[in-house]
UniProtKB/Swiss-Prot annotation:
It catalyses: CMP + ATP = CDP + ADP; dCMP + ATP = dCDP + ADP. This is Cytidylate kinase. GO terms for biological process: nucleobase-containing small molecule interconversion; pyrimidine nucleotide metabolic process. One of its GO terms (molecular function) is ATP binding. The gene is cmk. It comes from Pelotomaculum thermopropionicum (strain DSM 13744 / JCM 10971 / SI). It comes from the Bacteria. Disulfide bonds: none annotated. It is an enzyme of class 2 (transferase).
Amino acid sequence: MNSFPNIAIDGPAGAGKSTVARLLSKELGFLYIDTGAMYRAVALKAIRKGVDLADQPGLSRLAAVTSVNLKTDAEGNLRVFLDGEDVTEEIRSPAVSKAVSLVARVPAVRERLVELQRAMASGGGVVMEGRDIGTVVLPDAEIKIFLTASPEERARRRREELAARGYIVDQHQMVNEITERDRIDTTRAAGPLVPAADAEIIDCSSMPVEKVVKMIVARVSAGRRE
């Protein structure tokens, strides 16, 4: 295995992909690429501009003139820039969470962002998380992980995340939103959410994030010894 393999982490909303990928990238000294944040940035712009989320040609035109950049700040945290503006916090709002799947299903939007993501991974040594990384964006990634958890557990995690930002959402409502997002993500024509054939599936419903990170680090270490 390459000493700086690309690591693809896929999974449904609320599975803990971002947390695992962030900790893993710090542990290995790799670049962390949050592809979901890139789609959220485009969704935020669509909301701001009043673009109908059912208007796929309109969303395609919007994506074509949108710049999304990812940078790591001095504390090692990922910052998301939309046309030069730091929108790291705003893209996590409930409104964007509802809109993002509708934006991400548009083929032209995905094609634009996939091109940017592949360019960032071309030198190896990235931890990239999303919903079609192992199947579409980086099908040749040396390590592929499909991280999942029960809808109830994912809803609980997402509620806690939103509460920390000042948004209070009912558990039943959140389970329904998670379930609907799963339906949209798994049935879309472009890059549907499915595990890659050679992905390791990890159910972290009752597994601490530190254990998940150790499992993946062990895989990287084992690969380097081969």
